């Protein structure tokens, strides 16, 4: 079986899915103590890198996704599927798991 090479630019989410690059979590506390990976909070902030075409409605039309590529978003803590590509962390979310846009 041939190996599949996946590049971030080739990821095309389906339906109402949104592909988000995770913002790095804090490496140390306010007091300067370095945190091990096991003590870090799971990130909830990221930048949208790809969006799907939207959820299909009963009449066959699609509901547009409210976020666009480049938007910063806040998402549910345990939502989505974590993906690592090229040493970077990403998460594939349903649009409903996005809580807010961040200016």
UniProtKB/Swiss-Prot annotation:
Taxonomic superkingdom: Bacteria
Transmembrane residue ranges: none
Chief localization: cytoplasm
GO biological process: chaperone cofactor-dependent protein refolding
Keywords: Chaperone, Cytoplasm
UniProt similarity note: Belongs to the GroES chaperonin family.
Function: Together with the chaperonin GroEL, plays an essential role in assisting protein folding. The GroEL-GroES system forms a nano-cage that allows encapsulation of the non-native substrate proteins and provides a physical environment optimized to promote and accelerate protein folding. GroES binds to the apical surface of the GroEL ring, thereby capping the opening of the GroEL channel.
NCBIfam families associated with the record: PRK00364.1-6, PRK00364.2-2, PRK00364.2-4, PRK00364.2-5
UniProt name for this protein: Co-chaperonin GroES
